[in-house]
Amino acid sequence: MKKKQTTKALLVTCITDHKQDFYRLAFSYVKNQDDALDIVQESIKKALSSVETVRNPETIKSWFYKILVRTAIDFLRKQKKIRVMDDETIEFLSKGKEDHYKDTDLHEALDELPYRYKTIIILRFFEDLKLEEIAEITGENTNTVKTRLYRALKLMRIQLTKEDLS
């Protein structure tokens, strides 16, 4: 009973400390504030109901990321949404005086990636996680994560080159 309470307290602390990161990750999938909040809320509910299954409390953040990513992908499968970049989304995702066109092209290229590649790109470059952490979250071998990362970057490069030529 004591371990469950400790793990639950760690989970609550983790969610509180990283709520912006979790929201940003959910938003990167659905491009809608309300849906992103729903995904985070659903992930928290799932995590709290299964917190006793955590074997190593030190990996609670990675464990929650895994729940969040799977919840976001499930949401997209259920909704089968066509994501449109509106002005609010572009403004939310852009930072400062960056070139909005390049930023938009980058996000469109990212959106066109299959989920298994998109997840790795988001976790690596937007959430700044190490390859080992990504492997733990996705349940894949570290070498598989590396391979998918390089393939994803190659696919994005091809997509961005196509857009530059057109």
Curated annotation (Swiss-Prot):
Family: Belongs to the sigma-70 factor family. ECF subfamily.
DNA-binding region extent: 131-150
Gene Ontology MF annotations: DNA binding; sigma factor activity
Function: Sigma factors are initiation factors that promote the attachment of RNA polymerase to specific initiation sites and are then released. Positively regulates the expression of proteins involved in stress responses against bacitracin, paraquat and tellurite.
Motif window: Polymerase core binding: 38-51
Protein's name according to its UniProt entry: RNA polymerase sigma factor SigV
Source organism, top-level taxon: Bacteria
UniProt keyword terms in alphabetical order: Activator, DNA-binding, Sigma factor, Transcription, Transcription regulation
NCBIfam families attached to this UniProt entry: sigma70-ECF (TIGR02937)
CDD domains hit by this protein: Sigma70_r4 (cd06171)
Native source organism of the sequence: Bacillus subtilis (strain 168)
Name of the encoding gene: sigV
Phylogenetic placement of the source organism: Bacteria, Bacillati, Bacillota, Bacilli, Bacillales
Swiss-Prot/TrEMBL GO biological process terms: DNA-templated transcription initiation; regulation of DNA-templated transcription; response to stress
Subunit text: Interacts with RsiV.
Pfam families registered for this protein in UniProt: Sigma70_r2, Sigma70_r4_2
